[in-house]
């Protein structure tokens, strides 16, 4: 029978000092022996997805205490990728994932906490906490802040839906008036919550639900809606039960590694492909799998991408649907229901509620459930009122969207495509693979051949695009922006956005060893592995080289003779210590980022730290 971890600090005469300190935090004799639950919050006033979380940790803590546990809250950092975008701040985004994971480990292990409730929301915070959860393998429940309501405004006598990406595109479009650009900017992000499309934050929150580590509805229920409060109350109550099941009954099914098994990872990736999630999710799932010692690799993602249909198209791939529309259609469980009916899911998995996948679908899939409370929850809709307050409105859609032919979520026979919204490409330029969000690619660009325009920073590429140096038919190559080469694997949202702004969004391709925002669409291929800084062939591409891309064939090839590539490699190696670094790039890199780069692996490994360098 496992012993409560917290007993290390609460039992025995030699722990009198520790107990004295616990008493100073408010604990009493009656509390020693109860499970100590870490409430891992990520409140910050820097991030709209987290600005409303200040009081939610207290809400969870009160429920933990009422359910027989002891709650102790701490906070992690949280970087807003949108605010950090387009300047040196983006170098810190991906490395912050590792810092978050480590800080959770440090706090939980230093104080011997027994279990956790992770209150996350945005891009690197959910993955960082997920990595820590699987590393620590103690009972955990995720409950996120929830999605932002979609923005809405009236232009040319027409009401249109908006999000952050619209503000970025129109702000850089010289044909849009200052007045219209300002109106879009002011309307794009109306409430607290994670940005309203299927960007990285919402994609990851959907995936924690598919993994079984959060409750049904967590990935899609709006941050502003009163119904979301129940998810936090349930999490506080449920985590005490999970802790007692494990520590008092030796029930290992309560542990995250039992819940997030390989079968669960495959289900999560299947969902991701079906909903056309952010390409960043690939990076984060691979990293989380390594922490949980799950044998889940790029090969598994490639295999799944060839058989899973694209069932749900959401912004930025279309402006018709946002997360509030996904929720109205049944949310994550609605998509899983369609996948389950197509025989594409592993049923032998369970979630933090203790329900198997078939049980979860029977209760929460709006297409089959007869539970009025479930249907009412999925009818929770937007209010259209600017606010930074959680649970501030109780509006409901007049009806659910159960149209599986032309609605937000489609049945397999009416899929947008029979192969899904993400694909892995291989070829000489990406021997270990690269990722493209096919959900956002125009059908006319699925096969593309063009000359390379090579840049060694996203800043140089952006300047060239806006300066008219990139023309239709070009393949923009941005290298030395990988985990090691950047360092930090910046998101290339500005170059892809600027391609759209100058009318080249459907007539150019972009490939990079960096990554993309969840807001990216178009023929944007990222995570090229191995990266240039690790000797990858992308580091040998020259201006004018022809690059062939075939998404259906899952191929990406640099059309240069092997003998020429071998000669280029010798030339590069002759640079000595400067080999596999940018030729001319001015970039200030801090000691902290250099430390990150020294251990970073390429994207096909999840950009995690190289354990071999540490003897692990």
From Swiss-Prot:
The modification N6-carboxylysine is found at residue 124. [2Fe-2S] cluster binds at residues 122, 195. Pathway: Amino-acid biosynthesis; L-isoleucine biosynthesis; L-isoleucine from 2-oxobutanoate: step 3/4; Amino-acid biosynthesis; L-valine biosynthesis; L-valine from pyruvate: step 3/4. GO terms for cellular component: cytosol. One of its GO terms (molecular function) is dihydroxy-acid dehydratase activity. Gene3D superfamilies: IlvD/EDD C-terminal domain-like. Functions in the biosynthesis of branched-chain amino acids. Catalyzes the dehydration of (2R,3R)-2,3-dihydroxy-3-methylpentanoate (2,3-dihydroxy-3-methylvalerate) into 2-oxo-3-methylpentanoate (2-oxo-3-methylvalerate) and of (2R)-2,3-dihydroxy-3-methylbutanoate (2,3-dihydroxyisovalerate) into 2-oxo-3-methylbutanoate (2-oxoisovalerate), the penultimate precursor to L-isoleucine and L-valine, respectively. PANTHER family: D-XYLONATE DEHYDRATASE (PTHR43661), D-XYLONATE DEHYDRATASE YAGF-RELATED (PTHR43661:SF3). HAMAP family: IlvD. This is Dihydroxy-acid dehydratase. The gene is ilvD.
């Amino acid at each position: 029978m496992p012993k409560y971890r917290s007993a290390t600090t609460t039992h025995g005469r030699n722990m009198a000092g520790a107990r004295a300190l616990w008493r100073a935090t408010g604990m009493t004799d009656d509390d020693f022996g109860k499970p100590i639950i870490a409430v891992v919050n990520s409140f910050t006033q820097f991030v709209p997805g987290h600005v409303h979380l200040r009081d939610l940790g207290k809400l969870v803590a009160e429920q933990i205490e009422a359910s027989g546990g002891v709650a102790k809250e701490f906070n992690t950092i949280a970087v807003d990728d949108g605010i950090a975008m387009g300047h040196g701040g983006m170098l810190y985004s991906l490395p912050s994932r590792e810092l978050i994971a480590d800080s959770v480990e440090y706090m939980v292990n230093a104080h011997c906490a027994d279990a956790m409730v992770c209150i996350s929301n945005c891009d690197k915070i959910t993955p960082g906490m997920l990595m820590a959860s699987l590393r620590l393998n103690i009972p955990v429940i995720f409950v996120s802040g929830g999605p932002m309501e979609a923005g809405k405004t009236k232009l040319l006598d027409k009401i249109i839906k908006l999000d952050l990406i619209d503000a970025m595109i129109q702000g850089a479009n010289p044909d849009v008036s200052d007045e219209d650009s300002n109106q879009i900017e002011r309307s794009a992000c109306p409430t607290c919550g994670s940005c309203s499309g299927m960007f990285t934050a919402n994609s990851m929150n959907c995936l924690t639900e598919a993994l079984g580590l959060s409750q049904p509805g967590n990935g899609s229920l709006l941050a502003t809606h009163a119904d979301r409060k129940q998810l936090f109350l349930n999490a506080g109550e449920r985590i005490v039960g999970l802790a007692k099941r494990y520590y008092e009954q030796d029930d290992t099914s309560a542990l995250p590694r039992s819940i997030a098994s390989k079968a669960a990872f495959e289900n999560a990736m299947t969902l991701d492909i079906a909903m056309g999630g952010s390409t960043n999710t690939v990076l984060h799932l691979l990293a989380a799998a390594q922490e949980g010692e799950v044998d889940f690799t790029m090969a598994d993602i490639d295999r799944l991408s060839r058989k899973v249909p694209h069932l749900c198209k959401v912004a930025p791939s279309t402006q018709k649907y946002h997360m509030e529309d996904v929720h109205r259609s049944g949310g994550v469980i609605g998509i899983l229901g369609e996948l389950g009916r197509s025989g594409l899911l592993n049923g032998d998995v369970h979630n933090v509620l203790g329900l198997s996948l078939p049980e979860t679908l029977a209760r929460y899939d709006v297409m089959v459930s007869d539970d009025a409370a479930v249907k009412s929850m999925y009818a929770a809709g937007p209010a259209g009122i600017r606010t930074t307050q959680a649970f501030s409105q109780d509006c409901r859609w007049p009806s659910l969207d159960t149209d599986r032919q032309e609605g937000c979520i489609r049945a397999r026979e009416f899929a947008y495509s029979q192969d899904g919204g993400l694909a892995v490409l291989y070829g000489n330029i990406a021997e270990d693979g690269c990722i493209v969000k096919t959900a956002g690619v125009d059908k006319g660009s699925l096969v593309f051949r063009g000359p390379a325009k090579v840049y060694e920073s996203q800043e140089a590429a952006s300047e060239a695009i806006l300066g008219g140096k990139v023309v239709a038919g070009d393949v923009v190559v941005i290298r030395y922006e990988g985990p090691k080469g950047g360092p930090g694997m910046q998101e290339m949202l500005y170059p892809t956005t600027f391609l759209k702004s100058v009318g080249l969004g459907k007539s150019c391709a972009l490939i990079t060893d960096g990554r993309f925002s969840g807001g990216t669409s178009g023929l944007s291929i990222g995570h090229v592995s191995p990266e240039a800084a690790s000797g990858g062939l992308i580091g040998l591409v020259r201006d004018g080289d022809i690059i062939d891309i075939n998404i259906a064939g899952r191929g990406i090839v640099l059309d240069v003779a092997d003998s020429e590539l071998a000669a280029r490699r010798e030339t590069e190696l002759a640079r000595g210590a400067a080999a596999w670094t940018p030729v001319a790039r001015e970039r200030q890199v801090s000691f902290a980022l250099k430390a990150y780069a020294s251990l970073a692996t390429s994207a096909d490994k999840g950009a995690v730290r190289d354990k071999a360098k540490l003897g692990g």
